[in-house]
């Protein structure tokens, strides 16, 4: 099998520009062995190893049923439309390939029909999008909403015309036989290789999320790319949550049922209005948006208790009213089941004294989520692996801390796995420079953003933009963008002003832009060549100590006799930093400077752990040296 990766192998012969790499060959060997012996394997493969081909080739050669799961939909689409067909063609693979996304990624024909019938109540632009979608529904074969270019991805129409596990009518749906989810699932059941994402994999394994039985078909090989995201995503699925969005969707379905099928039951409209209003009132009690807080502490507040009681009563009323009309409308019957489910969830969320969970809430400008999350998913994930014997393969560029994979395997309860650490083949000694500038402002001192922007401006201008400024908070992101826009003539792009895809397009086409962003640009973004040669990180990405989930994990670690900083905070921050750093050098010809604006990297003992986990680039504290490197990378 390793011959596929030799200079004369199948891949080199069939793929233009394919260059064999030793780490890639080693990884392919390990994957083939793990599949052959049906055992778990954990591989950290540094950027540029070519890990995608390294797991695809042996997986296709094995002639078994394979599931490949990614952390992001972007990588999922790239795998299915680019990498998988390329390797399959090179190896003359004859098996069937399928792409499967979560239910809410497909147009729901029944909900589209309901919205068109109740259309008079929609805002003009939303109604216009619904009309466009009716015509698109007749043209699309898959119903995958990411392929619809005529309606913007942030249109309010999308949540109205896609279904969730909560509101899908399942086999009771009048349009069941034309359902895009059913078709996608059938294709996946019949396929030999299915590309999914972690959310869908876990939803199906844990929640059995579908009215159709198991979505993820029986497989012999499970491969997780971007596996560093798995522990956090798994904790969502092993917990419970209830959001105002779910409650308002429920209220909307009550309204549609009343206006289309049950016009004689006016109570439906009344209880829908009351539910929507009480959800809105509860959100207003929560105060400022963008904050994640402790639900146990929140529920001690008398005003919150009162608002929650009214929300509880409104949900109870919906349940009672829907119960009286059961059997008269498939839509209302499904809504009744959701009302029952949400009553149960709200009751569980109010039982805040159960140990082993973090109880938290967060709110955006219009919505809120109440949630409980288990402090550890190791035992649960171990059960999931035991239920599905076969090869479990986990890979990412960022799994280790200080060359040790223990933090990752322990969080998921992975035992007796083979492990492999493959360094990046890039020559960081020549291709990159790490700069931790002198005289940095303290992170929380007044005017920190102004001071930092003034310090970084000469470097960004000397590089003619072509820079990512990655921030650890939204506040710092906005403050820095404001400072840069006031003092520079280069285009300054800001995350949130348009979609992620459009921002990246603007960044690449401008050729001299500065992109100021936060967490969503720390990973899964691939900009090669001269377009990006400077990455600046505002500070070490420790999660806020006020984050209730982090607090609870630290407390749990303390109770078990561990050191919360060394075992929880530090490893999480190291892995996040490695992701951000990975944006800079994406190819053997790339050159660039990485700037980390945090003295702790060189002044605190734990800085050594961060540095040991970063690529081995030369280091400096002199901004002028960094500017010289950018002007003439080969002279260093």
Residue locations for each model-derived region?
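A substrate-engagement module of RecA-like helicase motors
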Residues: 1-14, 47, 64-192, 199, ...
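Signature of the SF2 helicase/ATPase Hel1-core->accessory helical subdomain module
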Residues: 61, 77, 82-85, 165-166, ...
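Conserved helicase motor "Helicase C" RecA-like lobe of SF1/SF2 P-loop NTPases
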Residues: 472-496
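Conserved RecA-like P-loop NTPase helicase motor core
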Residues: 437-447, 497-602
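Conserved RecA-like ASCE P-loop NTPase motor core of nucleic-acid helicases/translocases
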Residues: 66-72, 394-395, 465-472, 595-597
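Walker A/P-loop NTP-binding motif
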Residues: 32-33, 52-65, 82-86
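A contiguous, basic/glycine-rich beta-loop/short-helix subdomain that forms a polymer-engagement track
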Residues: 159-194, 205-212, 317-440, 447-454, ...
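Conserved pre-motif I regulatory segment
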Residues: 1-43, 57
């Amino acid at each position: 099998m390793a011959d596929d990766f030799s200079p004369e192998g199948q891949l080199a012969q069939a793929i233009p520009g394919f260059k064999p790499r030793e780490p890639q060959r080693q990884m392919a060997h390990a994957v083939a062995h793990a599949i052959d012996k049906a055992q778990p394997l954990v591989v950290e493969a540094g950027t540029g190893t070519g890990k995608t081909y390294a797991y695809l080739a042996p997986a296709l050669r094995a002639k078994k049923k394979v599931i490949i799961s990614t952390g992001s939909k972007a990588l999922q689409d790239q795998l299915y439309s680019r990498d998988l067909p390329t390797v399959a063609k090179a190896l003359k693979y004859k098996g069937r390939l399928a792409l499967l996304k979560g239910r809410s990624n497909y147009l729901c024909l029944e909900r589209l029909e309901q919205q068109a019938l109740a259309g008079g109540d929609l805002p003009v632009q939303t109604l216009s999008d619904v009309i466009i979608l009716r015509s698109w529904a007749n043209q699309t074969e898959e119903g995958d909403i990411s392929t619809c270019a005529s309606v913007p991805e942030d249109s309010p129409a999308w949540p109205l015309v896609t279904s969730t596990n909560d509101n899908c009518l399942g086999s009771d749906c009048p349009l069941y036989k034309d359902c895009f989810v059913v078709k996608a699932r059938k294709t996946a059941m019949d396929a030999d290789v299915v590309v999914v994402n972690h959310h869908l994999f876990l939803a199906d394994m844990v929640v059995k999320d579908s009215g159709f039985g198991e979505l993820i078909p029986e497989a012999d090989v499970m491969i997780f790319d971007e596996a560093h995201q798995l522990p956090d995503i798994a904790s969502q699925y092993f917990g419970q949550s209830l959001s105002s969005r779910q409650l308002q969707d429920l209220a909307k379905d009550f309204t549609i049922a009343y206006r289309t099928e049950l016009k004689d039951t006016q109570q439906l409209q009344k209880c829908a209005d009351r539910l929507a209003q009480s959800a809105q009132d509860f959100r207003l009690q929560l105060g400022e948006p963008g904050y994640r807080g402790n639900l146990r502490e929140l529920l001690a507040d008398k005003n919150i208790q009162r608002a929650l009681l009214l929300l509880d009563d409104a949900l109870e009323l919906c349940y009672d009213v829907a119960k009286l009309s059961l059997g008269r409308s498939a839509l209302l019957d499904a809504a009744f089941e959701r009302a029952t489910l949400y009553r149960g969830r709200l009751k569980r969320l109010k039982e805040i004294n159960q140990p082993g969970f973090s109880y938290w809430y967060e709110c955006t400008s219009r919505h809120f989520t109440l949630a409980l999350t288990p402090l550890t998913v190791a035992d649960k994930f171990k059960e999931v692996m035991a239920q599905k014997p076969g090869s479990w393969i986990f890979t990412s560029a960022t799994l280790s801390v200080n060359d040790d994979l223990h933090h990752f395997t322990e969080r998921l309860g992975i035992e007796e796995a083979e492990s492999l650490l493959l360094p990046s083949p890039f020559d960081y000694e020549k291709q990159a420079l790490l700069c931790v500038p002198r005289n940095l402002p303290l992170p929380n001192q007044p005017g920190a953003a102004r001071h930092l922007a003034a310090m970084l401006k000469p470097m960004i201008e000397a590089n003619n933009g072509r820079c990512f400024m990655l921030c650890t908070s939204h506040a710092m992101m906005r403050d820095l963008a404001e400072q840069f826009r006031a003092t520079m003539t280069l285009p300054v792009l800001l995350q949130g002003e348009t979609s992620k895809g459009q921002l990246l397009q603007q960044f690449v086409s401008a050729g001299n832009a500065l992109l100021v962003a936060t967490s969503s640009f720390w990973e899964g973004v691939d900009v090669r060549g001269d377009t990006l040669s400077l990455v600046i990180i505002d500070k070490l990405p420790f999660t806020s100590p006020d984050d209730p989930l982090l607090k609870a994990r630290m407390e749990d670690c303390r109770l078990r006799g561990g050191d919360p900083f060394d075992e929880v905070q530090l490893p999480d921050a190291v892995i996040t930093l490695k992701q951000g750093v990975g944006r800079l050098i994406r190819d053997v010809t790339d050159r660039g400077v990485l700037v980390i604006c945090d003295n702790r990297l060189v002044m605190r003992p734990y800085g050594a752990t961060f540095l040991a986990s970063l690529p081995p680039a030369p280091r400096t504290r002199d901004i002028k040296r960094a500017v010289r490197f950018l002007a003439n990378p080969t002279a260093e």
